[in-house]
Every structure is written in C-alpha cells, then in structure tokens.
Amino acid sequence: MSKIYTKAQFWKCALQVNPASYLAYRGQEQSLTEDEYNRLPLQACKDENIKVLDIADHGNVDGIDAIRNVMNPEGILVFPGFEIATTEKAHFVCLFSENTSKDQLNRYLGAL
C-alpha cells in the first residue's frame, strides 16, 4: 500500500486473526504445519478480497513473522499484536504499526 491517497479509502479487514500457535493456548494440538495453517487465512483473504488483517495471540508473538511472510508478498497488510487479559478477565487486543518487529512486541509484552 505505497500509494498516496488523497480521499477516503476503505479496505476490507479481518481483525484478530489467530496464528497457528493459538490452539496450544487452548490446550489443543495443531495438526497443520505453521506454513499450511498460514495459507488458509491467505486463501480466505484472497477469496474475500481482504487487504488488511491483524494477527494476535494470547501473550505470544511467535507467529507474527511467518504470517507476514505469507501475506505481505500478496499485498495484504498485517498489523501485528497480542491479546492480554486482566485479573478481572477482561481481554484486550493490542495492535501495532505494520512495521513493528517481533522483538519490539516482545519488549512491550515484557513491560506489562
């Protein structure tokens, strides 16, 4: 998305997409490889003309780079992030700029 837009522009988005590792958070085992899993949301994005998605897992950012490497070459912008929960069981999805590195996300998580 390197074009400069001078008027309102809307993109179809998929928000809070979970990475392959999400099932481990739920205590389940993933039957697909990470690459196989990442190709499923890629195909869904292509089928539905989705141009933007965010990737968020519970306190884990390990799957960010792998899904970016699949989505970005196809012109799909990925906002990386993570989900956190409070002691009151409120959940927050924290999203960051598309250029935020996995290391920076880990620093944010470590500061919480």
Describe the function of each predicted region.
Residues M1-S2, L42:
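Generic recognition of flexible, low-complexity loop/linker segments
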Residues S2-I4, F10, A66-L112:
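Extended substrate/RNA-proximal surfaces in nucleic-acid metabolism proteins
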Residues W11-Y22, H58:
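Histidine-centered catalytic micro-motifs
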Residues C13-L15, L53-I55, V78-F82:
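Hydrophobic faces of well-ordered beta-strands that scaffold small-molecule active sites
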Residues P19-D35:
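Acidic/histidine-rich helix-loop elements
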Residues L23-Y25, I64, A90:
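Active-site-proximal flexible loops/turns
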Residues P41-H58, E83:
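Divalent metal-dependent hydrolysis catalytic cores, especially in the metallo-beta-lactamase
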